[in-house]
Amino acid sequence: MNTAILVLIINKNKKDFLSVSLKNDHTDFNLPGGKVEHNETYIQTGIREVKEETGLDVYNLHYLYKDLDNDFEVITYYTFEYQGDIHTRENHIVKWLPIYDLNKSKKWSKYNSMIYNKYIDLKL
């Protein structure tokens, strides 16, 4: 089974999250993340993918949600702890969006709605 890790990075005011545009559609945004590589833990994958896609270092990732879709597993973590400057060498845009925009992704609206609801349920 293939596994992908997403990381919900929430800013200090708890009102915005860091989003990454899709590589082939700069008008649609999602969470930073990607596939788990050989001999990598889920947390290591999340840290690596965030660094690659945003330039930020993230710390203290907490489990939020897991979904199975056919032969693909997607696990989402969240954190409020990050350091560094936003920059990317990949072909996408990185920007802060209001947390309520999380469920507006065109491609991932169902999954992101679940993430949004799980985050709201935490009452952080």
Annotated model-derived regions:
Residues 21-22, 33:
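Residue-level recognition of conserved beta-strand positions in structured domain cores
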